[in-house]
């Protein structure tokens, strides 16, 4: 898929070489066979990996396999210090003697009314939250060059979900968004 962005207008030309790569080498090919817990980390602006395809890979993992993920916003080929801490906590939870809770990953929903976007962040309340941010980009198909903006926090709704808002510029066809929740135990999830 290198150079072919997930949300491009054009169709992917599937030649024999591309079919072989997807069937045998690409992460999509073996994700369904993974049986161990997974910590999936990626940068949002990598020139080597299409950030938009990360959830495609995770969607191929069996529902019985536990996984969590975290994104490094605006990083290219490196991960941020929060991902490093996630690795430490994940390894300690899997191979150490620490009982570390990994809640389910947060979910973000968006409702549109004209140029106004209302975003709702639903997260696990099994751990205390330190902070949360919602990142958004308008219309940039190539994830490597997206300039991520943060949405304005407007408060919690009656069910405890966090509410954010963003005003789009009006000429955008596509909006890309994700959330990052940092917990007081040092864990960060997207």
What are the roles of these predicted feature ranges?
Residues 44-46, 72-73, 139:
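Acidic beta-to-alpha connecting loop that harbors the catalytic carboxylate
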Residues 81-82, 90-136, 149-170:
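Surface beta-strand/loop "capping" patches
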Residues 172-186:
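Short, aromatic- and glycine-rich surface loops/edge beta-strands on solvent-exposed regions
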Residues 1-14, 69-71, 78-81:
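Hydrolase active-site cap/lid region
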Residues 34, 40-42:
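Short beta-strand/loop motif that positions the catalytic acidic residue
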Residues 58-78:
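Catalytic histidine neighborhood in serine/cysteine hydrolases
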Residues 14-30:
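Active-site nucleophile elbow and catalytic-triad environment of alpha/beta-hydrolase enzymes
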Residues 46-53, 79:
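Conserved alpha/beta-hydrolase "acid-adjacent" motif
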């Amino acid at each position: 898929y290198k150079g072919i962005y997930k949300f491009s207008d054009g169709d992917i030309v599937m030649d024999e070489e591309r079919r072989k790569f997807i069937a045998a080498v690409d992460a999509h090919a073996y994700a369904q066979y993974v049986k161990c817990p997974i910590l999936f980390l990626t940068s949002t602006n990598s020139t080597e990996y299409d950030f938009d395809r990360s959830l495609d890979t995770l969607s191929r993992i069996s529902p019985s396999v536990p996984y969590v993920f975290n994104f490094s916003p605006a990083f290219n080929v490196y991960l941020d210090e929060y991902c490093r801490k996630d690795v430490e906590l994940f390894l300690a939870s899997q191979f150490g003697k620490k009982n570390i809770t990994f809640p389910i990953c947060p979910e973000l929903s968006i409702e549109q009314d004209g140029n106004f976007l209302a975003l709702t962040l639903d997260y696990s309340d099994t751990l205390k939250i330190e902070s949360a941010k919602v990142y958004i980009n308008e219309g940039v198909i190539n994830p490597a060059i997206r300039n991520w903006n943060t949405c304005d926090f407007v408060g919690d709704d009656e069910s405890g979900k966090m509410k954010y808002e963003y005003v789009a510029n009006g000429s955008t066809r596509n909006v890309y968004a994700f959330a990052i929740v940092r917990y007081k135990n040092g864990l960060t999830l997207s």
